[in-house]
Amino acid sequence: MNPLRSIQHNIATPPISGGQPLDAVGPQAQQSHPKRISPSQLSQSAHQALERLSANAEHQRLASLVRNALQDGTFQFQSSNHTQVTYKASICLPADTDTVRTDHLINNELTVQARLNDQSEYDIVSAHLHGSSKAISFDVPSPPPAHGSASSVLSERTHLGMSRVLSQDAVDSSSLETPLLSSPDHSRPPSQPKPVHIGSVRRDSGSLVSDNPVVQALLSFAQADQAFPPQAASIAGVQLEMRPRRDIEKALEEFKGAFTVVKAQLMSGANSSERVDEDVNADIHIPLLLKAIERGAAAFGPNASIGQNSAKAFLASCAPKITSNDDVLSEFINQKLKGDDDLQVRLGAQELLHVATKKEFQLGGLAGSIGVSSILGSAWELGASELLKNAIFGKNFSPSQYALQLAGIDSVPPLIIESMDTMCVLAIIKGMKGEEWSMSDLLPKALKAGAISSVVSFPNNVLQYAGFKSRVGDLAANSVTTEAAIFGAASGIPPEVKESEELMRAGLFQSMKDGVMAHSGEGVDTKKTIERMTRHALDIAPGESTAVKSMGLASIVGMIPLIASNKATGLLSEQVLRIFRSAVFNPIEAIALNALALGGRVNVPGLFDSDNAKHARVVQTILARASQHMEAGDRDISAEELHQMLAPRSEFLRHVGSAIVNGMNASFEAIPALVRKLGYGEAPLAERIPYQDLAVPDTSRQPAP
């Protein structure tokens, strides 16, 4: 008696066969069976059943062994009765499940029970794997007859159940029941994350190859110093997946929390030889992850830890796991990865970096910005402006006569509109960074930006009423003042980027001082190293990088009203332009931020890469470097090489936006710098970082081992 029958649970699935005899008076009793059974002799339903089993994590191993043995022709006739036939194959498996070395293989007995159907094809009834220490099996019981003949019953519905039995004495009475579902997607546990990289695998000239570049790089690494077992990918339809091993978003939060620098020892504003602890709350997780990809575990100092785990162990636990419908293949690769700590650290860091740099659409901030600009801007442009001016100057006043007064009136609304819009823009940036924010934090920055916008818009407003006689000169002057007005409207962004840059520099300095991040080494300019790390991190950080690019986009799109006006091409009427200014021009930064976030998901080969494509290239490079250099010390990726993959030089908007942001910050800093030269005010944070202190590691702040 089959010990599994008593615990079988049945579920409805697609048919296993087109017609299946339920008694002895069918083809089973009329025909002798071949000495060997091959895949071509199986029914389509049997092939489908094996496919579904291969997608089930509990039964991948057994299904793969059955398919491989069928393909190799190693199943030999064993016995038969009036209902079914048994085939047996001897196969080699690792004696120790934690190793795949060929010198540890032992013989195991694989048997399948099959039944010949009305089409003279074999349906698989059950399969069993017996070894010295365990047995694995699944059964396909027959359904009870109903509504006529067996063929009609089975063509409509077949009940299929499976059981997996693990024991110390071949088979015991305990089992773990897993239903066979109708598709790989359904067989995946709900909590199991979707694969990040997936590709088909096939054999070619003795090696395994894939159509996916990342999977191909993984295969190249796995077979760099040892060939795959002959059973691996020996049949068609094999797929390999790289999927997260754990909840990556939760892991990222743990990593960020562990490496947020709360205080930094900076120079005192009064005396540069004194050190004071200053609150910085610097987020340095992105530069640390970049450094871990570049150098592996060597990126961290002796005090880098997350809870009770070292940074190295934590990142290794975040490395992706490999799954496949060929369990021999996935087991072989997972064991190769398991034995390479350096590679796991780099892959784990890349997994976290991919999530850390993901740009999310910020609907709330965008809606707020458009709402403020559309309501207040349209109310001013289409009604309030004309009513107020007519009330002050009369209905038939001459605009050129009162140009300065009119420009002054037009410069007042930006103080309100741009202040509220800047609040929305800064909230979007904070949201992209995953940071909490409050009105009290953003309001002073927003009011300052609104005041700047009001002042800077004045020259452009004057030219709307009193231009130059020369059309070329008038157009040139309007172009300059329009760009100035655009920059003024976005004046809340550059200081935000600068603040992030200064805090990150201070955080990296302190982490290196405390032995969290590895010291840059003797003869290396530490200041330049930290500045480069900061620049590379901000170029891919979701908030800052998008903000910088939005400045470049706004500087281009913001010129449309001028180009379409009667000062240039005259394509649009003044009424239409007023609506455009209210609906598009005023909230251009918020629109640009979200447009760029969505644009990061678009991939056009040969033109620009999506964020996913960039990170896939990083994974491919990590694996390729590991294949070329089996020693961890020879695998380092240069900072510039990694930066080029994630932030290519071809990113036009980033270069334009960076020039604008740096120029605006320099102009904002001009007057405070002059005041400091006169002996007033305190040096900015960036100038109070004592890089010279890193010449000797600070052991006083390091915890005892």
Swiss-Prot record:
Give the domain of life.
Bacteria
Q: In which residue ranges is the amino acid composition biased (Polar residues)?
A: 1-11, 28-41
Where it sits in the cell: the answer is: Secreted
> Which of UniProt's keywords are assigned here?
Hypersensitive response elicitation, Secreted, Virulence
Major location, coarse class? secreted
Could you tell me which residues belong to the region Disordered? 1-41, 173-207
List, as start-end ranges, the regions of compositional bias called Low complexity: 173-184
Q: Could you state one GO cellular component term attached to this entry?
A: extracellular region
Query: Would you kindly state one Gene Ontology biological process term found in this protein's UniProt entry?
Result: symbiont-mediated perturbation of host programmed cell death
Function field: Effector protein involved in non-host recognition.
Give the protein's recorded name.
Effector protein hopD1
Annotated source species: Pseudomonas syringae pv. tomato (strain ATCC BAA-871 / DC3000)
Q: Which gene encodes it?
A: hopD1
